[in-house]
Amino acid sequence: MKEELVKLIIDSGCIKFGHFILTSGKESNYYIDIKSLITNPKALKLIAKMIKEESRKLGIEYDKVAGPELGAVPIATALSLETDKPLLIIRKKKKEHGTGKLIEGEISPGDRVLLVEDVTTTGGSVIRAAKILKEHGAEVVGIFVVVDREEGARENIEKEGFKLYPLVLVSDLFEAAGVSKD
């Protein structure tokens, strides 16, 4: 399944070269434009199936699936449908209108939540989401990411007491594509 995902990422043209500013604020000579992948039903089904299988193999039990907006929402939705587990969406900022929620979906103290993300660089966005879930009494039992750029996310996430499970490492992508990230 991993090889199939790597091929889909490459064939979807998700690896872009040039000058980019990442969400983390870091500058990079490449960008993983995962949005074209996570709007593809075939890719979403594969990603959801992989996360379901990997979490089962690792013995990770969870009650709910969560993802920070925007990139992780399609992934979390696909996983929610694949597993029949309720979905939580973590907003970037609290709504200024309506209910003013930071988390969409029903969350209760003691919920075991599997958090998903599209791409990690330093892990800042997903750490923020994990802390919000924790503040609401949930236990984040694992964080799955489609692509880890291998730029400190794993270490930063583990420093905060969470565990990162990448489906694909950026080095896997460059190796399969036969290119150097430098």
Swiss-Prot record:
The entry's keywords: Glycosyltransferase, Magnesium, Pyrimidine biosynthesis, Transferase
One Pfam family, short name: Pribosyltran
EC code(s) of this entry: 2.4.2.10
Gene3D superfamilies associated with the record: 3.40.50.2020
InterPro entries given in the database record: OPRT (IPR023031), Or_phspho_trans_dom (IPR004467), PRibTrfase_dom (IPR000836), PRTase-like (IPR029057)
UniProt-recorded name of the protein: Orotate phosphoribosyltransferase
GO biological process: 'de novo' UMP biosynthetic process; pyrimidine nucleobase biosynthetic process
Organism: Pyrococcus abyssi (strain GE5 / Orsay)
Entry similarity comment: Belongs to the purine/pyrimidine phosphoribosyltransferase family. PyrE subfamily.
Subunit structure: Homodimer.
Cofactor field: Mg(2+)
